[in-house]
Design a protein with these regions (language model features):
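Active-site-proximal alpha-helical scaffold in enzymes
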Residues: 105-135, 162-196, 236-242, 350-373
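Conserved catalytic cysteine-centered active-site region
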Residues: 29-31, 79-153, 157-164, 202-228, ...
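Conserved active-site "lid/cap" helical segment
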Residues: 18-108, 116, 172-180, 201-207, ...
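Short glycine/threonine-rich loop-to-helix capping motif typified by GTGT followed
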Residues: 83-92, 266-270, 302-326, 332, ...
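Beta-strand segments within the central parallel beta-sheet cores of soluble alpha/beta enzyme folds
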Residues: 70-79, 100-101, 129-134, 181-188, ...
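Condensing-enzyme catalytic core mediating Claisen C-C bond formation in acyl metabolism
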Residues: 18-52, 185, 216-279, 283, ...
Length: 408
């Protein structure tokens, strides 16, 4: 039976009100926190650096970008990539904090952290928050695999990340007529942007035919439908309006954030064609007081091409089932299409550090709002941007977070 887009479970109970009105101003993060510093590590391969060292280097880079020092930091945020968690990293980095958060939702952890940092700042728990990401999936041995309650029931069937995303793509094709050619356009757009990024892992512009002729990994996903695997990381500095305005950096203000988790909910039939973005998106838009029509640039999590397509639908940039038509013919290419996306090349071409691409999505959105993206991909008059990510496995249990920012 084909999936019914109208049957997607919507927000219920208390949270339904978030879709209908903005949050109370005294409970909202809107305008109460600014991104003062952003830094992406230039390396994509770091065999001679430790993970902790990479965390320290990105922290230094973000603080220097903001014009602050570690002595100014009183809040710290990290996820599962941080060796020893927040306690060890605060000690290693030489920080003195009065607030910390080690929420781990996989690839979207840093979008979640951004919202949590803004909430902490709005509540007066800290005034300068540092968020770091770093890891070495390319050159280091993989860490022990975390297991959920379903592990013993699924491991025997050799379910892998590629298999599961392949199932999502196949189901979307079955239900809505999406084609491999349409998915390929997402990679094509990313490659057009990556050619201008000197740090991108893959800089060559590709065609739809190139994508379709690349080896099949998990039907219908080809190798070029999959993200790169890179070492590296990134960091952000979030602060109060007063401190941000005292610094010599362009002002980027947070105006909305939402987060959600999707899972099988006690054995219910699982619909592979939508993500938790159907819930995180409306919350962020309601808090920001804007619509998809106001978004000039979008950073969209791109572990696979199908990830992008589904999230564009779920966030409301196009109707459910029409993502294939929306992304085709260069519609995501800056200067060509209606919605420029991932102008650094994204995870499909540039960087997917620690297999957690949410951090770089925020960083490129900040570049666009500051007017610091490469001139060939800079979006004219970019005043409102969206960053969105997922963490976990898109088709089954996963989290999503949506952040909306504006230039001041």
């Amino acid at each position: 039976m084909a999936s019914d887009p109208l049957a997607i479970p919507r927000l219920t109970g208390q949270t339904i009100r978030w879709e209908k009105r903005q949050r109370r101003s005294d409970l909202s993060i809107k305008g109460k926190a600014y991104i003062a510093g952003a830094y992406e590590h230039p390396t994509r391969k770091a065999p001679d650096k430790s993970i902790a060292q990479l965390h320290a280097e990105v922290a230094k880079g973000a603080l220097e970008d903001a014009g602050l020092t570690k002595a100014d930091v009183d809040g710290y945020f990290c996820a599962g990539d941080a060796p020893g968690g927040a306690m060890a990293m605060v000690d290693y980095l030489g920080l003195k904090v009065k607030h910390f958060d080690s929420t781990d939702t996989g690839g979207c952890s840093y979008l979640v952290h951004l919202g949590h940092a803004a909430e902490a700042i709005a509540a007066g728990k800290c005034s300068v928050a540092l968020i770091t990401l770093a890891g070495k999936p390319l050159t280091a041995a993989p860490p022990p695999r975390a297991t959920g309650a379903e592990h013993d029931f699924e491991v025997a069937y050799n379910a892998t990340t590629h298999n599961i995303y392949g199932m999502c793509a196949m189901r979307h094709m079955h239900d809505f007529g999406t084609t491999s050619e349409q998915l390929a356009w997402i990679k094509v757009a990313a490659s057009h942007h990556a050619q201008y990024n000197p740090h991108a892992m893959l800089k060559d512009v590709v065609t739809v035919e190139d994508v379709l002729n690349s080896p099949m990994i998990s039907d219908p996903l080809h190798r070029m439908d999959c993200c790169v695997v890179t070492d590296g990381g990134g960091a952000l500095v979030v602060t109060t309006p007063e401190i941000a305005k005292s610094l010599k950096r362009p002002l980027v203000r947070l105006i909305g954030q939402g987060e959600a988790i999707k899972g099988p909910r006690g054995g219910e039939a699982l619909d592979l064609t939508y993500s938790a973005g159907v819930w995180s998106g409306p919350v962020a838009f309601a808090e920001a007081g804007v619509t998809v029509k106001d978004i000039k640039y979008a950073s969209i999590y791109d572990s696979f091409t199908i990830t992008v397509l589904m999230q564009l639908e779920d966030l409301g940039f196009c109707k459910k089932g029409e993502g294939g038509k929306f992304v085709a013919d260069g519609n995501l290419i800056s200067g060509v299409g209606k919605l420029p996306f991932n102008t650094d090349g994204g995870g499909l071409c540039s960087n997917h550090p620690v297999n957690r691409g949410g951090m770089t999505k925020i960083i490129e959105a900040v570049r666009q709002l500051r007017g610091e993206a490469h001139p060939k991909v800079q979006v004219p008059n970019c005043d409102i941007a969206l960053a969105h990510g997922t963490g976990g496995l898109l088709g089954v249990r996963h989290a999503a977070s949506t952040v909306i920012m504006e230039r001041v």
